[in-house]
Amino acid sequence: MKVVVVGDGAVGKTCMIICYTKDEFPETYTPTVFDAHKGNMDYNGKEVSLHVWDTAGQEDLARLRPLAYPNANCFLVCFSLVDRESLKSAYTNWRNELITLGPGNCPKILVGLKSDLREEFMKDENKRAQCVTREEGMKAKEDYTF
């Protein structure tokens, strides 16, 4: 099964993928150009092999991203829970890109990342306004049709 992960740069896509496929937590941030990882999951009692394609969120690499889209079985559209703009971008930028360039009837799942940083951000008055609230996340789940 081919899973393609998209979203703005630095929202946590690569970290999520490495945690899932290698059971490791990367301590440093390295922007991704393009990478592919393998993992397995149990689905209805059957082991399924996942091929997870990690794409660059940076605009200057936008021409490379669509190379990962053909034959995708699923897209994970990622945003950071500590960056409200990345949630808006999930709908305005990533939704439009997948509608235009992605396979038509492919499921798209909205994924909030960096939940481990929310508590720290909520304590800081300057950073608090950047956080996506639970209510906003639930509303996005209902409103953001892909």
Model-derived regions: residue spans:
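Ras-like small GTPase catalytic G-domain
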Residues: 1-6, 10, 15-23, 27, ...
